[in-house]
Each structure stands twice: as structure tokens, then as C-alpha cells.
Amino acid sequence: MRRDDNWFTEVLEEEGMAFSLRVREKLHEERTAFQHIEVYETEAWGRLLVIDGCVMLTSRDNFVYHEMMSHPALFTHPDPRRVAIIGGGDCGMLREVLKHPGIESVVQVDIDAGVTRAAERYFPELTEANDDPRATLLFDDGVAWIQDQPAGSLDVVIVDSTDPVGVAEGLFGPGFLGQVYRVLGDQGLMVQQSESPILHRDTILERLHGHMRGSGFAPVVTLPYPVVSYPSGWWSATLASKGPHPAAFRESDARAKAFATLYYNADIHRAALAAPEFCKGLLTDQ
């Protein structure tokens, strides 16, 4: 919702809080079969993508989210080659994954082509890798797609979803997580956006950890990171592994990476493994 014609405001009624950005104009609005998509030009945060009234990304700070949802997992796997992205319609995750030269194939499965079309038009910097021959973009149900994949056929699965309501709710459940475990190889990992440790520790995060462990994953580790435009300003990615621990990542490769990042590096990777006292035993899997 907007407080007036010059502001976009996301209100979190249950948390008693709101986040606002001053906007210059609305660039795009459409209602697809799945969700309500809006794009704004803001005064200070570049362009703003909103889905169903919730901030999805801004030009100014999306790099933190996309880098922390991709590179920690890819540098934890010993040799990632086959990757699937479930969701990720803005294609920023696809761009980050394809920076890794060893990647042979990435399949991105998002249910709503409208998000990708909006990103191509208004966030071209995020979609610059869409024509990479290693990339396949599908517009389908990610839960159903995972069920159809052969056992052991993927190295890393990244679940870049909206909040766990509506079309994304099934991506947080034990049925889907069990299927992800099945399609991953022996050293496979999945990473899931897991909301705010401040706002959702006792609801979404605790439940997600339980479902992941119940599906066979160990270790399960949550990496927190800042995203100013998201509720509370503090977000997280949860890595669930069939073997490798994020603390034993390929640190020398991360330090010698041949591609540019704006947030992620080997020191950030290691620092993200440190959990505050109120989250120890949950975020650290100890």
C-alpha cells in the first residue's frame, strides 16, 4: 500500500511495522494468473519490484540477497556442475550461478513468466545471463518439476521463492524438501531463502530446519545477511547438505574467484557462519 502518492509502503500488520520508499512513478503493473506485479522508480533506491504488495528487490541492495543465496552453496559443494533454481523469476540468481565457470547446466523453474518479462524490461542487469547456452528457463510448477527429475541428477538446488504463502507455500513443506533430497547427488546441497531471524525464528526458521532434517539433510545451517529493503533489514539463507559443511567450503577457490561480487567473499562466507546467542542451536545446527 502507499501512504500517499509519493510513497510505496509495505505494511506488516502482525509485526506492527512498515517499510517505505519514496517513489517517482509507477512503471509497470499487471495481475497475472498467479500474482500482482508492480515496478516503481524510486527516488534513492533505483527500481523497486513488488509482488502482492511485498518488496521483492531494489536496484540498490538486491546484490546482497542474490550473492548470499548462491555463492556460499556453490563454494561449499566440491564440484558443482548441475544446478536448479526454483523460483528466481527476476533472474538475478541465474546470473550469479553462471559466474562459476564449472557450471554445465542451470534450469530455472518459475511459475510466473510475468516476473521474468518484467525483469527483462525494467531490470536488464539481472537478466544479462538469460541467453547463456548453459541456461534453461521454464515457466512451470517447481514442486511438480522436482518430482519429475531423476534421483541424484542435481548438485545444487536453490529455492529463490517469495514468502511461504500462496503459490510459494509448498516450497517450504516436507514433501517438496524430501523430493529435493532425492534428486541431489551424494554431495548435494540445497539453499532456501528463509526469511528474517528476528521476525521468523520461532515460526518459519525453526519449522524449516525441522523439515530439512526430517528429510535426511545434515548439516543444516542458516546464514544471516543484511537486506535493508526486507522486513527487519536482516534476512537469511538456509543451506541443507547431504555431506559438505559450509564451514569446510573451498576457501582458496573463493579467495581466487575470477568473477566480481559486491558483497560475497571468503571472509563474509566464514563470518556468516557465526550465530548470535539467541539463534545458537538453530542457525548453527549445533
UniProtKB/Swiss-Prot annotation:
Keywords: Cytoplasm, Polyamine biosynthesis, Spermidine biosynthesis, Transferase. Catalyzes the irreversible transfer of a propylamine group from the amino donor S-adenosylmethioninamine (decarboxy-AdoMet) to putrescine (1,4-diaminobutane) to yield spermidine. Spermidine binds at residues 66, 90, 160-163. The lineage of its organism: Bacteria, Pseudomonadati, Pseudomonadota, Gammaproteobacteria, Chromatiales. PANTHER family: SPERMIDINE SYNTHASE, SPERMIDINE/SPERMINE SYNTHASE. One of its GO terms (molecular function) is spermidine synthase activity. It is found in: Cytoplasm. The keyword Cytoplasm applies. One of its GO terms (cellular component) is cytosol. Residues 5-242 form the PABS domain. This is Polyamine aminopropyltransferase. The keyword Ribonucleoprotein does not apply. CDD domains: AdoMet_MTases. Homodimer or homotetramer. Gene3D superfamilies: Spermidine synthase, tetramerisation domain (2.30.140.10), Vaccinia Virus protein VP39 (3.40.50.150). One of its GO terms (biological process) is spermidine biosynthetic process. InterPro entries: PABS, PABS_CS, SAM-dependent_MTases_sf, Spermi_synthase, Spermidine_synt_N, Spermidine_synt_N_sf. The active site is at residue 160. It is an enzyme of class 2 (transferase). It holds the Pfam family Spermine_synt_N.
